[in-house]
């Protein structure tokens, strides 16, 4: 691993690292916030997944999460949103290719060689964080938009791995909305049954009651993508039918930007702390 930058922040350390990923077959960067040490107990981790066009730095520089994370004693880990590099398949659109990995394992050429973000987030990155930093094995996950989709599918596909999950303006039924249809048809092929494995609503309907974990979703009602791309009410109905402990908050006037995230990130960190710090 190579340390790219480091900054003292609220008596903790904000760092950016590069490492060679065997899962993605390319170098990857991630950002991490290490809160000031409190005692000899390793702190828990919150993984944050960002949205389309983003990298590991958007949340770090725009969300203002470090102050509360330092207070609570929670490590923040921000991976990139896709594999990167000249040898990595790409597309001219903002919603496919680099910066738009959708947190799945691609099965179709040319994407399958590198686009295995699900395996990277499930296995390689947590193992790296565990081995290189003083952290506990308790973790939660959160994200925004495409990253909210990622957080939800990571939690739904891995019962017992996370204490809680939250999301801001998540894509919840990618099989049925333009962003998801475009990405899934390219990454996964035309078999729509294969798409269901990466769709939060489908995964929610297939879930077992004993696997449910506390879930918080915030959605601005002035979000330009709300009607066509996000549709959180569809997931809320699935959660209702499955008696899944999910809170959906519609926030009046808020849009899809990081100003929205910055306004409510403290709520999300305190929500996760209830379960991470048990």
From Swiss-Prot:
Keywords: Hydrolase, Serine esterase. GO terms for cellular component: cytosol. It is an enzyme of class 3 (hydrolase). InterPro entries: AB_hydrolase_fold (IPR029058), Esterase-like (IPR000801), S-formylglutathione_hydrol (IPR014186). One of its GO terms (molecular function) is carboxylic ester hydrolase activity. Belongs to the esterase D family. This is S-formylglutathione hydrolase YeiG. It comes from Escherichia coli (strain SMS-3-5 / SECEC). The lineage of its organism: Bacteria, Pseudomonadati, Pseudomonadota, Gammaproteobacteria, Enterobacterales. The gene is yeiG.
